[in-house]
Amino acid sequence: MLLILLSVALLALSSAQNLNEDVSQEESPSLIAGNPQGPSPQGGNKPQGPPPPPGKPQGPPPQGGNKPQGPPPPGKPQGPPPQGDKSRSPRSPPGKPQGPPPQGGNQPQGPPPPPGKPQGPPPQGGNKPQGPPPPGKPQGPPPQGDKSQSPRSPPGKPQGPPPQGGNQPQGPPPPPGKPQGPPPQGGNKPQGPPPPGKPQGPPPQGDKSQSPRSPPGKPQGPPPQGGNQPQGPPPPPGKPQGPPQQGGNRPQGPPPPGKPQGPPPQGDKSRSPQSPPGKPQGPPPQGGNQPQGPPPPPGKPQGPPPQGGNKPQGPPPPGKPQGPPAQGGSKSQSARSPPGKPQGPPQQEGNNPQGPPPPAGGNPQQPQAPPAGQPQGPPRPPQGGRPSRPPQ
């Protein structure tokens, strides 16, 4: 493809330079990017000015109606999006402005720029698809709309701005090795998948925020509040997930490892990042329907049980009595906090699944009063799902 583009560019340079001296002035110059675009068709038969030499990405896409953007070069962020039916101002590539972009009815866009070069301006007109983000680079702003999910950034790269509009996703996703952050937004928001081997964090709640469980040394952030808030990306494997969703649609950013989660924002505020591994998950999501993410691997109890008037109680961990069972209606459950293992505050509102049970068995939803042993407020995951919490 590159060779073909280069050859076309060379031919265009030789033939088009003479013809398009006059025409090129009328047209807005297009961006040069690695591959010059051949003259695109214009009103009558007018050859476009000479394309730039090879090694320069072409810039401007055709104008009018819907114009698909060319693929962005790898490793470079895409250029500015197109504008209505107005011809775009040409981008000036490094020292080599390309000839004017095609004008008139249909103008196919020139060849995409070679890798490592930013593409020219995106197409103009009603629909403007955003170019694909280059690999290894944070993507530009995600599409707008209440349903668009923020793009996942590549490992080690902060994610670009989340989609705009009702939903504002929280901060950057975790580094590589961490599952990405924000779940899709909209009526139902599934929680991000919990990392393997760790009980998932807080169960979803009604419109009431649950009082955060703050075990000593690892305070859990407050639960999300408001309508539908998709939870941010789940922490890396072995880490409990951070705070649940909050008002509006806001995906939560990934929590940094080894840090307790702060209180999540409320209402239309973006949620605080999730807590790192070894830390109890933040508050469960609240609001409309928030399905929780996938359950943890076998042998680990899943965090929040499903919502609904009835709250099934999860199996207690072996040898540890569980704290008080979940309560129906809008009753907050007072968790028994045995020394070294205080359970966080129970959920509130009609459908409040209890916090994550200890990892005894599949996905126990609510902890039960386990057999003789130490009365545990929140059951400790005997299998190492979660480190024991210091006494409050």
Curated annotation (Swiss-Prot):
O-glycosylated. O-glycosylation on Ser-87 is prevalent in head and neck cancer patients. O-Glycosylation on Ser-330 has a 5 times prevalence in head and neck cancers. Pfam families: Pro-rich. Residues 19-28 have a biased composition (Polar residues). One of its GO terms (cellular component) is extracellular region. The modification Phosphoserine is found at S40, S92, S150. Residues 19-392 are annotated as: Disordered. Residues 1-16 form the signal peptide. Residues 48-83, 91-144, 152-205, 213-243, 252-266, 274-324, 354-392 have a biased composition (Pro residues). Glycans are attached at S40, S87, S150, S330. InterPro entries: Pro-rich. It is found in: Secreted. Its main location: secreted. Keywords: Glycoprotein, Phosphoprotein, Pyrrolidone carboxylic acid, Repeat, Secreted, Signal. Sequence repeats lie at residues 53-72, 73-92, 93-112, 114-133, 134-153, 154-173, 175-194, 195-214, 215-234, 236-255, 256-275, 276-295, 297-316, 317-336, 338-357. Residues 53-357 are annotated as: 15 X 20 AA approximate tandem repeats of P-P-G-K-P-Q-G-P-P-[PAQ]-Q-[GE]-[GD]-[NKS]-[KSQRN]-[PRQS]-[QS] [GPS]-[PQAR]-[PSR]. Residues 34-47, 325-334 have a biased composition (Low complexity). Disulfide bonds: none annotated. The modification Pyrrolidone carboxylic acid is found at Q17. This is Basic salivary proline-rich protein 1.
